[in-house]
Amino acid sequence: MKNLLRALISQGIEALRANGTLPADSLPPDFVVERPKTRDHGDFATNAAMLLAKAARSNPRALAQALVEALPRSEDVSKVEIAGPGFINFYLAPAAYQREAASVIKEGHDYGRNLSGNGRTVGVEYVSANPTGPLHVGHGRAAAIGDCVARVLDANGWNAKREFYYNDAGVQIENLSLSVQARVKGIAPDQDGWPEGGYRGEYIADVARAYMAGASVDLEGTLVVGAKDAKDMQAIRRFAVAYLRNEQNLDLAAFGVDFDIYFLESSLYADGKVAEAVAKLQASGHTYEEGGALWLRSTDFGDDKDRVMRKSDGTFTYFVPDVAYHLSKWQRGYERAITELGADHHGSLARVRAGLQAMEVGIPQGWPEYVLHQMVTVMRGGEEVKLSKRAGSYFTLRDLIEEAGRDATRWFLIARKPDSQLTFDIDLARQQSNDNPVFYVQYAHARVCSLLRQAQEKGLVYEQGNGLANLGRLSDDASLLLMNEISRYPEVVEAAGVALEPHLVAQYLRELAHAFHTWYHGTPVLVDDSADRNAKLTLACAARQVLANGLELLGVSAPEKM
């Protein structure tokens, strides 16, 4: 409906140009059509007249009056008013909302989706956990946010490629290997011989036992077998990484998260991508030698200080493979690249972008885009559940899913803006009450399914065609409020895609569920009059469809029974 109003306003502006009220060469303003905070100010409002007033050399209210008079007539608009300094408020006719409800039924799963991305490719990288242990709840938030961002982008017409980057070539992998080797030798944490910086969780003992038992791990089609040799560090490293990568994959699968691409940091070295990145940076003239190290003059590109690329001992800093990895994304045709990271990685953003700009290979400024998430605090029984991988006090994503369930875990982890601190209340997530938002939303969907079953049990045949033809009967306030809420869904999908904020979908679904439950409690649905009954069931089915569409964007199920 916003598009309809934008079209009407644009036609009105053209009419003002034609009659000389506006200069013929004035540029069309980038006006806003939005829903007011309260419905007392109409269903939609625009600032178009205020933006045009200067070009027209007119008082904004006077120009607003002229624009209102120039608007084409539309049966979807019942009233237009001028408010404040020159806002124009639109009141929609019931027929507009009734037609929107019908569109939901006709479009089904596609309702709310758009083609703004035009099929272009966007790479979405998320989780990217080191393969050194099970996924913790922070990784879970990254997985939920990243997966939902990709789903929302798909709904906005983009071709989202989901990518997991494994840091399998750093110091952490060496510490992992030494930790497993110590366990293989029977050395426990805090005993003599335990490696400094070793991983202390009980899962290390699990890896060691599997390695010495000759267990096999099928990792994406490659079989890795425990060599049972306590001295073979290469074999231990290979098995430990494969074992823990597989464990992470199992957790992600249970969480409903999958990836198109698993990219290994080690492949950047093996395939010469790190060397290529260094060569491009040196060729661009933005590097220099100092103190036996190779530096990038990243301050030329907005970084707060220059960065070491190659240390005096000949090894590369983490910065170099990060830049090489993002260069590979550009070379693979990602018009957009989005990386979801914990907020503690904020310091790496400027240096990666600086490195990419310094290559001078055509990568635009602001590429890649970043979505940063804050920490998660998990509460149970009013007390915080501590998370500490290195100390071994380890509450994992798997633990959380087992306690709260997949749907509640996904919902709660994306329910707030990513850069907001998040408290996950396990007790609330397990409740089957209206206080639990995911239960409240899912129950609205199940309630419509129950209505249809009740109709069938009573021998009342639901005729969708008859319901569509009689939606005009539903002009009471509760029905129109529900239709109004339903009609917001395409705007929410678009806004979530632009802002990369899937929590907007969760917030909307809760508001839609509230509108539906309110309508349901105040509206007899299975009435004797078949036309009224079919119309009400059709409206209920429209609400159900939008609930299902939105829940799918969040990776949450839409149950038919609860």
UniProtKB/Swiss-Prot annotation:
One of its GO terms (biological process) is arginyl-tRNA aminoacylation. GO terms for cellular component: cytoplasm. It holds the Pfam family DALR_1. It catalyses: tRNA(Arg) + L-arginine + ATP = L-arginyl-tRNA(Arg) + AMP + diphosphate. The keyword Signal does not apply. PROSITE patterns: AA_TRNA_LIGASE_I (PS00178). Keywords: Aminoacyl-tRNA synthetase, ATP-binding, Cytoplasm, Ligase, Nucleotide-binding, Protein biosynthesis. It is found in: Cytoplasm. One of its GO terms (molecular function) is ATP binding. Its EC number is 6.1.1.19. A motif ('HIGH' region) lies at residues 129-139. It is an enzyme of class 6 (ligase). HAMAP family: Arg_tRNA_synth (MF_00123). Belongs to the class-I aminoacyl-tRNA synthetase family. Monomer. This is Arginine--tRNA ligase. The gene is argS.
